[in-house]
Amino acid sequence: MSKRRYLVAIGGILLHLMIGSVYAWSVFTGPIAKQTGWALSSVTVAFSIAIFFLGMSAAFMGRLVERFGPRLTGTVAALLYGSGILLTGLAVQVESLPLLYIGYGVVGGLGLGAGYVTPVSTIIAWFPDKRGLATGMAIMGFGFAAMLTGPIAQNLIAGIGLVPTMYVLGTAYLLIMLTAAQVIRKPRPGEDRKSVV
């Protein structure tokens, strides 16, 4: 069996683990509203914006993955999503609701779409003999992310505060996603995906 294809799968799972943290947004809404004085409903709008831009960017990102390769689109996803979380921290720090919507909603949402689409078709291409397993691996990280991110974020908020937590998570997402993106690539023409190391 190919060691390379499992490395690609791990990279894809890591990408999805990072962007899947979007589903832990509810952990942040209360603390953000409390710290800034914004209405809870105003804070939750950021999530809706992010999901909207996830869908919008995913719609056109698939073609870019095919044209430019998953390494580039994964890198773009890392830069956008990591920056979006960092901008979220800045938005809370300076108490700017529009910046929250732009940072988390637009920038982060675009990163979500790029990060979601990037590994799916790539992992499936490496596992032509196990398409069901490949699909499961491709989206597994996205599903597990909220379960992992929620407790980590709660502990960080309790330990170092809300804004530093956003900066720590944004930096971690950026670095982990950048690293993961570098191992993701399409199989080369004629490459035996079951035996290549």
What are the roles of these predicted feature ranges?
Residues 57-70:
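Helix-to-loop junctions at the C-terminal end of transmembrane segments
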Residues 32, 113-127, 134-135:
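Intracellular juxtamembrane helix-capping segments at the cytosolic ends
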Residues 84, 97-114:
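Hydrophobic core of transmembrane alpha-helices in multi-pass small-molecule transporters
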Residues 79-94:
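C-terminal ends and interior cores of transmembrane alpha-helices
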Residues 2-24:
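Pair of pore-lining "gating" transmembrane helices in MFS-fold secondary transporters
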Residues 23, 51-59, 147:
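Residue-level signature of mid-helix packing/kink "hotspots" within the transmembrane helices
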